Structures are given as C-alpha cells and as structure tokens.
Amino acid sequence: QTAVGKKGLFRFSAMISLDRPIMGGDGYPLLFQSGETWKGKPLVDRQHPHDLFAELSVGYSHAINKDLDVFGYFGYPGEPALGGTAFMHRPSSLYNPDAPLGHHWQDATHITFGVATVGVRYKNFKIEGSSFTGREPDEDRYNFDKMRFDSWAVRLSYNPTKDLSLQ
C-alpha cells in the first residue's frame, strides 16, 4: 500500500502461479479433490493447475473521517466480494500452498477475469458490492479470459475485533 495524500491509500497486487508449467495440465494428486476438468474430462483426486496470473489488481481507499472510508477495486483477474477470502489470497496460506478439499466448491471465484468492487466502511461494518465475470477460467492457464461482468454480489462484514470478521 502507498499513501496518497493525507487520507488515501493506493494498492497494486499481483499474484502468479507456476502450477501449469511445473505440474502440467492435469495438476497434481490430491486425494478426494474434484470439481475441474482437463481436456474435457473430470479431474478426480487431482488439484487442477491455477492460471499463471491469479491476480492483477488495483485498489484505492479514501478516509472521509476516522469512522468512514470509501473504496474501489478492479481486478483482471481478481476476487469479488463473495463469501470469505479464498485460500490462496489469505496470508495464512503462505506456507501451505496446497488447496483445501472444499476449494472448488467454496472458492469458485478466486480467479475471476473481470472484477469491479466498490464499498463503504463505517466503524466496524463494511458493505461492498461487486460486478464480475461469473464463471471459472478456461483450461488455457496462460491467457486472459474475456471480461463479461455478468454476475453481481453484495457482502456485509462486521469486525468486532482486529482478528475476527463475520459475514
């Protein structure tokens, strides 16, 4: 993050994955994992490789006062305001790069080619809304899929402490 003036914060994020060149198109063995395909066939007991570019995003937050912020975010690819943060975007996953078993079912939007989010934080509450491309990336892990902005989501969060977030 970089300060912009006295009340602004600008952020650029990039995340790359070397899954595809290292592991091949059908990924790596992971018992009980399912939910993806390779060359039209379901991957069973395997984790698919992620796209080379898992996130390229920019965000800006502006403090109106100590209790109120407004913010915007654009990702191509990025992550919309839908559910909890996907495993690969959490700081806690830094030393555990394997996908959890529920990854395909709970983190379906973690690499979304086209995300625009705006939101407001008031004290411990935050509401944000996203328009995004509502589909998984295609099987070509090196390209940028077409942005469609055909899905929408709203997320309300409450943070009673700095270590706890409820949605």
Regions flagged by a language model, labelled:
Residues 1, 50-56, 110-116, 121-123, ...:
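Residues that define the transmembrane beta-barrel architecture of outer-membrane proteins
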Residues 33-42, 94-99, 130-137:
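Flexible, solvent-exposed coil segments and beta strand-coil junctions
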Residues 125-167:
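Loop-centered beta-sheet repeat module
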Residues 2-4, 60-62, 119-122, 157-160:
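Residue-level signature of outer-membrane beta-barrel architecture
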